[in-house]
Amino acid sequence: MTEMSEKENEPDDAATHSPPGTVSALQETKLQRFKRSLSLKTILRSKSLENFFLRSGSELKCPTEVLLTPPTPLPPPSPPPTASDRGLATPSPSPCPVPRPLAALKPVRLHSFQEHVFKRASPCELCHQLIVGNSKQGLRCKMCKVSVHLWCSEEISHQQCPGKTSTSFRRNFSSPLLVHEPPPVCATSKESPPTGDSGKVDPVYETLRYGTSLALMNRSSFSSTSESPTRSLSERDELTEDGEGSIRSSEEGPGDSASPVFTAPAESEGPGPEEKSPGQQLPKATLRKDVGPMYSYVALYKFLPQENNDLALQPGDRIMLVDDSNEDWWKGKIGDRVGFFPANFVQRVRPGENVWRCCQPFSGNKEQGYMSLKENQICVGVGRSKDADGFIRVSSGKKRGLVPVDALTEI
């Protein structure tokens, strides 16, 4: 500062002794120095602290350098970028994240209802009431199979349709997961349940697995017998269950022998139970307990497999039942083949019954107790004793009646 004051005083002294022509030049130099100092103060005060430190080191100069160097004109403010310059990428000290374009929204899939005649009792999705009637009962969605009344379709038609569910899961449910395992406990189950996109367990799967496990537990603990859905109500009233778990027809006499051909493969080699002594009947009861609730069925119709895990059926095939936890699709075994088949395609063959094939068509009067049969139709004889007039009582599916013995051939 002393140097600056001395330098500023020197022109004053010189101005007193200098001629008038040089006075104006000295005043200009003083004015330039004054403007130079003011420009530095203006820069330091006007610039904010953030902008001041963002400037490069080459642009910053010490105050002594600013005072000692000749004045430099201030750079003009940068003009706004033109349209041609906007296309060029200019680096910025703090770049802002460029927003990504939004993904195209998928169209919402709505229900596609069509008229449907419901053969079974189906509740409405909206009012939860049963859909009843003979014709034009209600509507059902093509994709998700949701059932609604005609008057309830307007409110639910605007809702989103979840789409078609997996065919194998809907048909077979969770039966394949529980076949070769003991009855599982739902709380300690180690199965890997199917999870959705959000990682949550499917509630339908949990409900089905819980019901299946309860059915297996009840069957193993109480030895409950499984019956074919094709049996009529009157036929169930005539059947009684003995202590060993086998079922006999009440129409048979107490002296009639029950042939164990269709109960288990190991029992077909031995004679009837009436020929055995009481001491020899103990192994049979043990064998019956080991086999469990596996019964013999006969195929009534031909079934072609629709999936890899289906079991092909031919009329007259003998099937050993493995799992009947599902109402519509059962799991059975024919020789070395194991798979699923429709439950209404087979009929239960109980001890004492024979399987017959119709060798010639027969037309009978239903009101008189006769049953009509087509050629090669499979039926099961209810009793072993033939009627006096040459007729035998048989059943095929839900039909039941008398058929002449000449029209049947035992399989």
Curated annotation (Swiss-Prot):
Main localization, broad class: cytoplasm
Residues covered by region (Disordered): 1-29, 64-95, 174-203, 219-288
Matching PROSITE patterns: SH3, ZF_DAG_PE_1, ZF_DAG_PE_2
Outcome of substituting W329S: Loss of interaction with CACNA1S
Residues in Phorbol-ester/DAG-type zinc fingers: 110-161
Its membrane topology: Peripheral membrane protein
Record has Repeat as a keyword: yes
Pfam family, one: STAC2_u1
Residue intervals of the SH3 domain: 292-351, 354-411
Record InterPro entries: C1-like_sf, PE/DAG-bd, SH3-like_dom_sf, SH3_domain, STAC1/2/3, Stac2_SH3
Functional description taken from the UniProt entry: Plays a redundant role in promoting the expression of calcium channel CACNA1S at the cell membrane, and thereby contributes to increased channel activity. Slows down the inactivation rate of the calcium channel CACNA1C.
UniProt name for this protein: SH3 and cysteine-rich domain-containing protein 2
Organism: Homo sapiens
Gene label: STAC2
